[in-house]
Amino acid sequence: MSRVVSLLLGAALLCGHGAFCRRVVSGQKVCFADFKHPCYKMAYFHELSSRVSFQEARLACESEGGVLLSLENEAEQKLIESMLQNLTKPGTGISDGDFWIGLWRNGDGQTSGACPDLYQWSDGSNSQYRNWYTDEPSCGSEKCVVMYHQPTANPGLGGPYLYQWNDDRCNMKHNYICKYEPEINPTAPVEKPYLTNQPGDTHQNVVVTEAGIIPNLIYVVIPTIPLLLLILVAFGTCCFQMLHKSKGRTKTSPNQSTLWISKSTRKESGMEV
């Protein structure tokens, strides 16, 4: 997707058990190296005008072979929370901004107690896991679900507006999280070991693969093209001058040899008549 900037993962971070021990960068797909667990991508937009609706987020994930995030259990919820915590480390420029997940309600105007049961996952998952904020879902015209991410907001009745879920109008503009099937034999993966928890596991060492690094080099190479051209021109000019001087010396040497006169006295007596 053109509006998602693909960036490389940052350096590994030190952390304790249960934390996702790596700086997570917006637009970077993160995969487990055992290729048995899902991959994820956090799509964060600093500019509010670049954020997307629920349907746009859903289509963006599907266009890359993924789905809008579904959560199977609390372990997977905690994993996503850890990734978001590393996404918002000081200095990254990432702050407030909720994230679309794939939960939504197909129906209009339900406000009864049965409303929470009408929510379903857009990828077809049968997971019944929910992590609603206090007094949510509010139903009515709010049919699509976000994961709260408001670290600078004052706590509400249910505590800080972090990681719990809230239903919102589907045309509102937010960030989003994609989920992908485990990658099989990915192209040129770069593996770096560090500690993390897999969904459903506890305190286990895992190697995570950084996917999509080669395409991201485009963002590094393109800005350097003018400099590379300048260096190439300077190098070519230098080589031309050296070659020209070398040819000048080569031409001078034979001319000098033709003007050389022997100091020996020629014997011409034999030529007298």
From Swiss-Prot:
The chain crosses the membrane at residues 217-237. Found in spleen, testis, prostate and fetal liver. Expression limited to vascular muscle of testis, smooth muscle of prostate stroma, heart muscle, skeletal muscle, crypts of small intestine, and red pulp of spleen. B lymphocytes express isoform 2 only; peripheral blood T lymphocytes express isoform 3 only; granulocytes and monocytes express neither isoform 2 nor isoform 3. The keyword Ribonucleoprotein does not apply. One of its GO terms (molecular function) is carbohydrate binding. Pfam families: Lectin_C. Disulfide bonds join C61-C178, C144-C170. SUPFAM superfamilies: C-type lectin-like (SSF56436). GO terms for biological process: muscle organ development; nervous system development; positive regulation of axonogenesis. InterPro entries: C-type_lectin-like (IPR001304), C-type_lectin-like/link_sf (IPR016186), C-type_lectin_domain (IPR051505), CTDL_fold (IPR016187). Residues 35-179 form the C-type lectin domain. It is found in: Cytoplasm; Membrane. A protein of the expected size has been detected by antibody binding and Western blot in at least one of the analyzed tissues or cells. Interacts with RABGGTB. May play a role in the development of the nervous system such as in neurite outgrowth and elongation. May be involved in motor axon growth and guidance. This is Chondrolectin.
